[in-house]
Each structure stands twice: as structure tokens, then as C-alpha cells.
Amino acid sequence: TYAGNSHNLTALMDKDQFKFVKGNIGDLALVESLLAKHDIDTLVHFAAESHVDRSISGPDAFIQTNILGTHTLLKAAKKHWIDGPGNGLFHHVSTDEVYGSLNVSDNAFLEITPYAPNSPYAASKAASDHLVRAYHKTYGLNVTTSNCSNNYGPFQFPEKLIPLCLLNILQGNPLPIYGDGKQIRDWLYVEDHCRAIELIIDEGKFGETYNIGGNNELANIDVVNVLCKIINQKFTDTPEMKKYYPNSP
């Protein structure tokens, strides 16, 4: 994927419990061989095309990865755990985009909120959620699903709002604000997201869906204002930064 960078994994490469395999989740033979070779008992499915704007200009990749790729993983898990000798858990990482959009006066999404995807990305994730549920109901595959809000944190690809704004501020480029910037999003730090997923894997109930949020609901314009204040303070505290970012206002 264009958003992946193997250098982000450098700190893990010498760990005995870590193995890096470059492949495609749509490669059924590869996935089946990995499940069998390593006798995997927990599959956590993070892999996805996830940028809404890209899904609008090019939805095919989202259908291929998010729907067909998920189905490939499910087929491999079924073969190894249901039809074969293994036994395990398939955890599916999804998004709150499947529920649609929130207005200022709306309550937070619940696990029972009806699906109302508004973009090809959201629709592809909604479809994958339903496939995961179907494999549980039809074949008895042990599954859990989590629907998270907007993630942020280290190494995030700079097409997402927070890293893109930070780069644009430092480079003196216009900030990516759509309309009046009043769109409300909940922001979830990536480590908090991972802790929640670990809790679901350890204590979750098979077949259930769990919403994961950061309790940080902000309008996009407010997020941008916070970032501007942080950068401004950094330049105040460390004046020499200006020579590295001469175009920053």
C-alpha cells in the first residue's frame, strides 16, 4: 500500500515474537500458509484502504481490499479453524464511518446504531462488517468487531487531517479545511485504540461489536486551531526551528 512504510517497523525487527511478511491479504494461498505454518490462533484484521477522499476518486481499490480482502482472510480462517485442526479468533477492525455523520445535537453512535455509510470507503467497511458477522452466524467462526473513531498518532500517513495540517503549517501551505470546518469528529490516539482492541480480544464476547472512541469530539476547525497554537508555541520556545522551516508563518 502507498501508505505503508517498513521503516516504521524497525524497532520490532529483532524481536523473537515478530515476523514481517510482505504480501497481499487478497493472496489466499499466502494467508492459508501463514495460518498453518505459525499455528496462528488470533488474527487481528487492521488492513484497509481508509482515506475517504481517495474512495470517492477511486473506489475500486476500496472494494478490492476492504471487501474482497476481508473475505479472503475469512475464508482462510474458516479453513484453518473450522474445517481444519486449529481454533482461533478473528478480530475485525472497522470504523464509525459505517454509521454515517453526526450533527452537533446528535448523541454518540452506539453499537445498535443503524448503518448509514456515506462514502465508498464507509460502504466498503460496512460490507466487510457484514461478512464477518455472516461467517460467525453461518459457519460458527469466532469473531469480534470494533468500530473506532478517527485515529491519530506517530507515523500516520500525511493525507489524514492532523499530520497534513502539521506539514502544511511548517511548509507555509494552505490548510485543508472543507467548508466552514464545523464537521465534528471524535479523535482517538492510536495506542488507546490498540489497548481497547487488546481488551476486546482478551474479554470480548464472540459475535459482538464494540465501539471505540476517544471522548474527544471536536470540530475540524477547532483541531486546526489547536495545531496552530502548538506549532506557534514550539517556534516561540525553540527559535532555531525557523531556519529549518523558513516558510512557516
Predicted feature locations:
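A glycine/serine/threonine-rich, flexible loop-to-helix segment
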Residues: 105, 158-166
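Residue-level detector of alpha-helical hydrophobic segments embedded in or interacting with membranes
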Residues: 54, 112, 158, 241-244
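Residue-level signature of the cytosolic catalytic core of signaling kinases
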Residues: 5, 154-158, 216
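C-terminal substrate-binding subdomain of Rossmann-fold SDR/epimerase-dehydratase oxidoreductases
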Residues: 4, 23-26, 163, 167-249
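N-terminal Rossmann-like NAD(P)+-binding domain of SDR-like oxidoreductases, especially those catalyzing
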Residues: 1-151, 171, 191, 220, ...
